[in-house]
Design a protein with these regions (language model features):
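Bacterial N-terminal signal peptides that target proteins for export
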Residues: 2-26
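Compositionally biased, intrinsically disordered low-complexity segments enriched
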Residues: 20-34, 179
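N-terminal alpha-helical modules
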Residues: 33-275
Length: 275
């Protein structure tokens, strides 16, 4: 009965998480990306519908829904990254390439960390939790890359004058063409790479790192000794990703990255060793 209760609670939490994440910046990978995502992203809607299906009501079915959703977000990651390589200015392109390399390295090491943590637990509800923790960083990355790709997308092609000869007004009266991100085509671009202060000079960053270290140490104490290197490796890879990405998203975005990591570390520290 206790296991069934945990599964039911996990299903409700997953459904609530999809609704919350679709419309909230929250503790997200990049705050700007989450602020710009539509309140009802089709991928989130599809996941919510999948989780509600009767033939997916079992833990295995719920995990299957999350796996399919992760694949869809990964496709967004791949597509947005290719758009960035095509459209972004040289400095932004180099920055996002470095960020993506570090993100991929972190994700590989993070898979080993999740396995090490969930190997200390028992019960199908924890398998669902592990699947969710693998999904969310991919979603965060997809939103961040999609927002960046939209920012650098070329403006739509100008309408030929002849095609507008019968329309009211003239081309000179028309407002500047809007870019996909909603800004006029002739508007100055935001700086591709920002200067960010060291974290110890940024009070918000320093406070966030304090909280992160607290949960990191709690998890370290609960992990088996033979898994210590796995935790250190995953955290070191995440730090590399954070530092490579911070100049692209600014100090506020860096705090959002740390916030997402705090949420993960808190969850893992509360999960490790549960039976």
């Amino acid at each position: 009965m206790a296991t069934h209760g945990r599964i039911q609670a996990m299903r409700a939490a997953l459904a609530a998480l999809v609704v919350w994440a679709a419309g909230s910046a929250g503790l997200a990978g990049v705050g700007v990306a989450h602020a710009e995502v539509a309140a009802a992203d089709p991928i989130d809607v599809a996941m919510r519908q999948c989780l509600a299906r009767r033939d997916r009501s079992s833990p295995a079915g719920q995990i299957q829904c999350m796996g399919e959703t992760q694949q869809q977000w990964q496709a967004v990651v791949d597509g947005a990254y290719q758009r960035l390589l095509k459209d972004a200015p040289a400095d932004a392109k180099r920055g996002w390439q470095d960020s993506q390399r570090h993100w991929l390295t972190w994700r590989k090491d993070e898979v080993h960390l999740l396995k090490a943590v969930y190997d200390t637990t028992r019960g199908t509800s924890y398998a669902m939790s592990s699947a969710d923790l693998q999904l969310q960083p991919v979603r965060d990355r997809a939103l961040a890359l999609r927002a960046a790709a939209d920012r650098y997308a070329p403006p739509p092609a100008a309408v030929p004058v002849a095609a507008t000869s019968g329309a009211q007004g003239s081309a000179s009266d028309a407002p500047s063409a809007a870019k996909p991100n909603g800004k006029p085509a002739n508007a100055p671009r935001d700086p591709a790479v920002r200067r960010v202060r060291p974290c110890e000079q940024d009070a918000a960053c320093e406070h966030a790192l304090f909280d992160l270290n607290r949960y990191y140490q709690k998890l370290r104490r609960k992990m088996p000794a033979h898994s210590a290197a796995t935790l250190v490796r995953a955290q070191r890879a995440w730090v590399g990703f954070r530092d490579a990405t911070a100049p692209l998203v600014g100090e506020g975005g860096r705090v959002d990255l740390i916030g997402a990591r705090i949420a993960t570390m808190k969850r893992l520290s509360e999960t490790a060793g549960n039976q």
